[in-house]
Amino acid sequence: MAHKQVLFHSAAREKILRGASLLADAVRVTLGPKSKSVLIQKGWGAPIVCNDGVTIAKEFDLKDAEENLGAQVLRQLAEKTGDVVGDGTSTSTILAHAILSDGVRNVVAGASAIDLKRGLDRGTQAAIAALRAMATPVKSRAEKVQVATISAHNDASIGELVADAIEKVGGDGVISVEESKTTETLLDVVEGMKFDRGFLSPYFITDADRMESVLQDPYVLLCDHKIGALRDLVPLLEQVAKSGQPLLIIAEDIEGEALATLIVNQLRGVLKACAVKAPGFGDRRKAMLEDIAILTGAQVISEEIGLNLENATLQQLGRAARVVADKENTTLIGSGGDRTRIDARLGQIRVEIEKTTSDYDREKLEERLAKLSGGVAVIRVGAPTEAEMKAKKEALDDAISSTKAAVAEGIVPGGGLALLRAVAAVAKEEAACEGDERTGVQILRRALEAPARQIAENSAADGGVVVARMLEGEGSIGFDASRKVYVDLVAAGIVDPVKVVRTALENAVSVASVLLLTEATMTEIPEPKRERLPEPDLAVQ
């Protein structure tokens, strides 16, 4: 067992803060319309030029073990914020660092970390209430274009594309981003479905960067029972392998020999496959399997109707143009089913919605109707170079997530102004507190200025002057960093989704509070490498 190095109190906090500061300093340059880039060396291949906060955070790994602890906690913060809303990673990192650095200074001076945390929590609740109060619903296409454009680093073409996609499939619709075979970026809406079940094993991953299993033009096997015995699956696997096409298996569960065989064949390149659990439970699972069957043109292999897996043929399998599965969701793109049968199924579900008396059943039926009828918007990204295509795909992912978040909870003025307008609510909370709890609220109040200050500094303006002037102003009058003028930010299209700002703030306070409460660090002491001496009879003469 490796020995541990233990640091306590100020020594531990200083190291944690140092690591967090290094990551925050690398990420902060990516905030705002005048953002800069970070050049990242890869272990293989060419270096990458990146201005995406979460991508920079994922590459962060420091030599000093204690400093690395602080950096890795902030990295988790960026990843969590990105996973939830797809944007706001740089903002959450900057907020967390501002809270942590101010908090550490107060703890070293003798403040109670527990009381500081209580103050931070009180201030956060007041700030979030203020953000929700100033939110404006997103209804028009123009507003969606504004949100998507800002999130895509002011790329208007991406803003237009994302707004078109959301207009076609709705705020809850599925939007897939693929690589184009040409240099053009195009939008297409195809039949498809997304459900909340992911791959059963990470060995099915084909795209390591995005942690996804992607199957092109696969067969789709649907089964309403567990698959465990290898002998049941082998005949069908042999038929699919001969066809040269990938295979998606959707069943109640896939386990034991059957799952192991799929993984081994995947690793050896014999048969490209992915296995996922069927969505839903009980009778609802059977209904959803039938929905997928009609969409893909498959037949559900069910012993209830006399079908067994051992005798299944390729004719009983469905088809899809593309399947994308991650650890949580699976998306079927392109339908192999008959349009007439799909329309009939939609009509049947609508009749069931009209007849049901249960609100819960109605809600679930409406979900099925939306999944089956909504389709999938496919954005095919084209670019002259691989690096440009990757950057464009990342920008599209951010823009899609931000725009969906805006549709869900509304928008607020961007450029860090929304957090500055929440300062007044936090100040009221501050007046109701005392002692170290009040200090915690003050720390949050000061931290709320950090994003606006950083956006100004990234555009070569004086951050302190800009923040002071924005605080003096009213409404949505703020600093347009791209033109270095004070304008009505909402009218100028500089807006942020409430959900992104709220999530960034909540996650930042949560992570900073955890680090402030840390009294010790434990890291492994690397064992010295021992040089192996050659045997006497093998010594070089």
From Swiss-Prot:
<dbReference type="InterPro" id="IPR002423">
    <property type="entry name" value="Cpn60/GroEL/TCP-1"/>
</dbReference>
<keyword id="KW-0067">ATP-binding</keyword>
<dbReference type="GO" id="GO:0016853">
    <property type="term" value="F:isomerase activity"/>
</dbReference>
<keyword id="KW-0547">Nucleotide-binding</keyword>
<feature type="binding site">
    <location>
        <position position="496"/>
    </location>
    <ligand>
        <name>ATP</name>
    </ligand>
</feature>
<dbReference type="GO" id="GO:0140662">
    <property type="term" value="F:ATP-dependent protein folding chaperone"/>
</dbReference>
<dbReference type="GO" id="GO:0051085">
    <property type="term" value="P:chaperone cofactor-dependent protein refolding"/>
</dbReference>
<dbReference type="Pfam" id="PF00118">
    <property type="entry name" value="Cpn60_TCP1"/>
</dbReference>
<comment type="similarity">
    <text>Belongs to the chaperonin (HSP60) family.</text>
</comment>
<dbReference type="GO" id="GO:1990220">
    <property type="term" value="C:GroEL-GroES complex"/>
</dbReference>
<protein>
    <recommendedName>
        <fullName>Chaperonin GroEL 5</fullName>
        <ecNumber>5.6.1.7</ecNumber>
    </recommendedName>
</protein>
<comment type="subunit">
    <text>Forms a cylinder of 14 subunits composed of two heptameric rings stacked back-to-back. Interacts with the co-chaperonin GroES.</text>
</comment>
<dbReference type="InterPro" id="IPR027409">
    <property type="entry name" value="GroEL-like_apical_dom_sf"/>
</dbReference>
<dbReference type="InterPro" id="IPR027410">
    <property type="entry name" value="TCP-1-like_intermed_sf"/>
</dbReference>
<dbReference type="InterPro" id="IPR027413">
    <property type="entry name" value="GROEL-like_equatorial_sf"/>
</dbReference>
<keyword id="KW-0143">Chaperone</keyword>
<dbReference type="InterPro" id="IPR001844">
    <property type="entry name" value="Cpn60/GroEL"/>
</dbReference>
<dbReference type="GO" id="GO:0051082">
    <property type="term" value="F:unfolded protein binding"/>
</dbReference>
<keyword id="KW-0413">Isomerase</keyword>
<feature type="binding site">
    <location>
        <begin position="30"/>
        <end position="33"/>
    </location>
    <ligand>
        <name>ATP</name>
    </ligand>
</feature>
<dbReference type="GO" id="GO:0042026">
    <property type="term" value="P:protein refolding"/>
</dbReference>
<comment type="function">
    <text>Together with its co-chaperonin GroES, plays an essential role in assisting protein folding. The GroEL-GroES system forms a nano-cage that allows encapsulation of the non-native substrate proteins and provides a physical environment optimized to promote and accelerate protein folding.</text>
</comment>
<dbReference type="GO" id="GO:0005524">
    <property type="term" value="F:ATP binding"/>
</dbReference>
<dbReference type="GO" id="GO:0009408">
    <property type="term" value="P:response to heat"/>
</dbReference>
<feature type="binding site">
    <location>
        <position position="415"/>
    </location>
    <ligand>
        <name>ATP</name>
    </ligand>
</feature>
<keyword id="KW-0963">Cytoplasm</keyword>
